[in-house]
């Protein structure tokens, strides 16, 4: 156990072999999970400096500011890191849908336990 990393007060992310940490984004009001993405050191620094969520796109191989083309930015209300500093939690105020499909959350389908099918969820 790396006690300084796990219990200390210094931000010292534990990046994986690709230089990334997982980032979970939730709505700061409802707590709903909006999306999951990845951040490298540059994306984390840009997020903390600007107050708007920036990620590293594995498919594009570059930084990606959420909403850069759609306008659906994620204003960061609070950023947290887990106990061993390999995952980031961003509590955000979304300016629009989080998902590229237009859905509020990227997690808009549930997996039916009775078979390998996806069922669209209905917001209450």
Curated annotation (Swiss-Prot):
Q: Which cysteines are joined by disulfide bonds?
A: none
Q: A Pfam family in this protein? A: PRA-CH
> What cofactor is this protein dependent on?
Mg(2+); Zn(2+)
Q: In which pathway does it act?
A: Amino-acid biosynthesis; L-histidine biosynthesis; L-histidine from 5-phospho-alpha-D-ribose 1-diphosphate: step 3/9
Q: Does the keyword NADP belong to this entry?
A: no
What are its GO cellular component terms? cytoplasm
- Which locations, inside or outside the cell, does it occupy? Cytoplasm
Q: Which UniProt keywords apply?
A: Amino-acid biosynthesis, Cytoplasm, Histidine biosynthesis, Hydrolase, Magnesium, Metal-binding, Zinc
SUPFAM superfamilies this protein is in? HisI-like (SSF141734)
**GO terms for biological process, alphabetical:** L-histidine biosynthetic process
The GO terms describing molecular function are: magnesium ion binding; phosphoribosyl-AMP cyclohydrolase activity; zinc ion binding
Q: Where does Zn(2+) bind?
A: 83, 99, 106
Instruction: List positions binding Mg(2+).
Output: 82, 84, 86
Which free-text remark accompanies the cofactor? Answer: Binds 1 Mg(2+) ion per subunit.
Gene3D superfamilies in the record, alphabetically?
4.10.80.70, Phosphoribosyl-AMP cyclohydrolase
Recorded catalytic reaction(s): these are: 1-(5-phospho-beta-D-ribosyl)-5'-AMP + H2O = 1-(5-phospho-beta-D-ribosyl)-5-[(5-phospho-beta-D-ribosylamino)methylideneamino]imidazole-4-carboxamide
Where does this protein chiefly localize?
cytoplasm
The Enzyme Commission number assigned here is 3.5.4.19
Stated role: Catalyzes the hydrolysis of the adenine ring of phosphoribosyl-AMP.
Q: How does this chain assemble?
A: Homodimer.
**HAMAP family (UniProt xref):** HisI
Q: Which family does it belong to?
A: Belongs to the PRA-CH family.
The entry's protein name is Phosphoribosyl-AMP cyclohydrolase
Q: Which gene encodes it?
A: hisI
């Amino acid at each position: 156990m790396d006690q300084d990393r796990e219990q200390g007060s210094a931000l010292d992310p534990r990046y994986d072999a690709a230089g990334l940490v997982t980032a979970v984004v939730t709505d700061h009001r409802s707590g709903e999970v909006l999306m999951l993405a990845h951040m490298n050191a540059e994306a984390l620094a840009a997020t903390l400096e600007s107050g708007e969520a920036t990620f590293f796109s594995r498919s594009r191989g570059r930084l990606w500011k959420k909403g850069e083309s759609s306008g659906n930015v994620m204003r960061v209300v609070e950023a947290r890191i887990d106990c061993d500093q390999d995952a980031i939690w961003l509590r955000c105020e979304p300016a629009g849908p989080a998902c590229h499909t237009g859905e509020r959350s990227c997690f808009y389908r549930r997996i039916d336990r009775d078979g390998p099918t996806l069922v669209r969820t209905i917001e209450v």
